[in-house]
Regions:
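Bacterial N-terminal signal peptides that target proteins for export
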Residues: 1-11
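Sec/Tat signal peptide C-region and signal peptidase I cleavage site
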Residues: 20-26
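Transmembrane beta-barrel domains of Gram-negative outer membranes and organellar outer membranes
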Residues: 27-190, 197-200, 229-233, 242-245, ...
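Bacterial N-terminal signal peptides
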Residues: 10-19
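A mid-sequence, solvent-exposed acidic-amphipathic segment
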Residues: 192-240
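A cross-kingdom marker for long, charged
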Residues: 276-277, 288
Length: 295
């Protein structure tokens, strides 16, 4: 990651922490007081932030509202024809204003590893550290024409730098910047989300960042639409555009999902995910399964 981007990431994270310090008055904090409407904290993305499965939303993790601190943890498994992807992590939401998150991603190359020359069953690993700040608006309440808007940063660090560089990546770590707008139209039971992401990640960062040929940051889009059939059950679809810095035919992502709140604190998500071509192996479509516990 270039020095200007490192500086921007540091400044962005600092601003989020300053906002946290301004809001965090110990005498007013309700620890783990879960007062949000069920499902309105979203689920956990594969990168650890709150949102959908593959798209970040403006939501803040945990079930705490403006006077509390909440926490959530997730485990996600994606089963594809040639790969296996697992993510687990934790997120903290502070006063429905600031979110801090961490996720570890493990990407099993199975037989593809041998074909690519990195070894049968070689697993790519990545750490993702995230921070998000709600700027204005409310997901549920207020003017229906004013969404909840948040900015975020996700610093990603591949633990397989040699592999990333071997496929042509310029670096083994990088930072994504997001701007999200999300609104739940409660009277119609419809949720809509749009996210702009500035990124140089290859396959979410698992194959490094940028390219040795000079390709770097580009602006990508993430969108989600969901319908809430009941207080506890929602179905929807997501779409996420991807850069192709390495020239390996990296495709956009999409999924169709269903999420069910088994209890106020446990949400299960199942989806059909189409991740397209990954490292030249096409038609990577399969099951996305996730469990989230939130307080």
């Amino acid at each position: 990651m270039t020095l200007p981007m490192r500086t921007a990431a540091t400044i962005g994270t600092g601003l989020l922490l300053m906002a946290f310090a301004q809001d965090a008055r110990a005498e007013d904090i309700d620890w783990l007081a879960g007062d949000k409407l069920v499902l309105t904290n979203g689920v956990s993305t594969i990168e650890g932030a709150s949102g959908g499965g593959i798209a970040s939303w403006s939501t803040i993790a945990g079930r705490a509202t403006d006077s509390g601190i909440g926490i959530s943890g997730h485990v996600t498994i994606v089963e594809l024809p040639d790969y296996g992807w697992q993510s687990h992590g934790v997120s903290i939401g502070v006063m429905n204003r600031v979110e801090l998150s961490y996720a570890r991603q493990n990407f099993d190359t199975r037989d593809v590893g041998a074909a690519l020359g990195i070894g049968q069953g070689y697993t790519l690993n990545q750490d993702v550290f995230g921070a998000k700040l709600r700027l204005f608006g409310d997901l549920v309440y207020g003017d229906p024409l004013v969404p909840q808007v948040s900015v975020g940063v996700q610093h990603k660090r591949s633990l397989d730098g040699a592999v990333a560089r071997a496929v042509g990546a310029a670096d083994d770590e990088g930072t994504d910047f997001t701007l999200s707008a999300t609104k739940l139209f409660l009277a119609h039971s419809v949720l809509v989300n749009a996210t702009a992401r500035l990124t140089e990640a290859n396959q979410n960062g698992l194959l490094g960042f940028g390219s040795a040929a000079g390709k770097g940051y580009s602006l990508q889009f993430e969108g989600s639409v969901a319908y809430q059939f009941s207080r506890r059950f929602v179905v929807g679809a997501e779409f996420r555009t991807k850069p192709d810095n390495l020239g390996l035919g990296e495709d956009d992502w999409l999924d169709v999902f269903a999420a069910y709140a088994v209890t106020d604190n446990l949400t299960l998500t199942a989806a059909y995910a189409d991740l397209g071509s990954i490292a030249t192996f096409e038609n990577q479509r399969g099951a996305f399964l996730s469990a989230q516990v939130a307080f």
